[in-house]
């Protein structure tokens, strides 16, 4: 069943603590925060470490402080399978030790650690989702990314939903 009145999409700079707390105070009875805010380009993260650390890690820290202040008890965090890096044993499962090999992955792992600290202290309940991209982007069924085009499955899905492109091809 559709409940558009039960959800609020809020776009703001998580490092702006005053605005963040103001928004959370305005939306009473928040059951759960879905935290998808992050920069996510691996190549760019190597060139702009401070930008990625401040946005992804410091932003998450600000959000955690704000949800504690505002009494929100649940968070679902959009992490990344990139935190696993290169593993000797395949397939990778969630018990694999993280071995981040990019600054982007490092920021996701640090954010997970910060969230876990809050959860272990009893402040929040938390789930971190470590996404893999299981969908081939090439018609020969190869897991391949063409970096000259959007490589974000969600952005393509949204383009289809907004009728900006006709079809989503999954191979």
Outline where the language-model segments fall.
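Short alpha-helical oligomerization interface
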Residues: 42-59, 92-100
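Short, conserved active-site loop motifs that form the nucleotide-linked donor/cofactor pocket
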Residues: 6-8, 126, 168
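Conserved Rossmann-fold cofactor-binding substructure of NAD(P)-dependent oxidoreductases
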Residues: 8-32
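Short alpha-helix in the Rossmann-fold core of NAD(P)-dependent oxidoreductases
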Residues: 38, 48, 53-60, 76-79, ...
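A hydrophobic alpha-helix adjacent to the NAD(P)-binding/active-site core of NAD(P)-dependent oxidoreductases
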Residues: 9, 52-53, 67
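Active-site Tyr-X1-5-Lys
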Residues: 86, 99-137, 154-165
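Conserved active-site region of classical short-chain dehydrogenase/reductase
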Residues: 18, 57-65, 113
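Conserved Rossmann-fold NAD(P)-dependent oxidoreductase catalytic core, especially the SDR/UDP-sugar
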Residues: 35, 61-103, 117-127
């Amino acid at each position: 069943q559709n409940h558009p009145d039960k959800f609020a999409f809020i776009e703001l700079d998580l490092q702006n603590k005053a605005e963040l707390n103001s928004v959370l105070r305005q939306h009473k009875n928040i059951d759960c925060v879905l935290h998808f805010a992050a920069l996510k380009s691996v190549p760019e993260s190597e060139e702009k470490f401070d930008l990625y650390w401040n946005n992804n890690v410091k932003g998450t820290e600000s959000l955690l402080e704000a949800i504690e202040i505002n009494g929100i008890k649940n968070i679902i965090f959009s992490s990344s399978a990139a935190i696993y890096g290169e593993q000797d044993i395949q397939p990778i499962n969630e018990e694999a030790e993280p071995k981040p090999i990019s600054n982007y992955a490092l920021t996701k792992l640090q954010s997970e650690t910060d969230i876990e600290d809050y959860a272990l202290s009893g402040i929040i309940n938390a789930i971190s989702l470590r996404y893999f991209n299981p969908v081939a982007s090439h018609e020969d069924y190869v897991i391949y990314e063409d970096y000259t085009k959007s490589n974000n499955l969600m952005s393509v899905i949204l383009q289809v939903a907004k009728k900006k492109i006709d079809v989503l091809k999954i191979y």
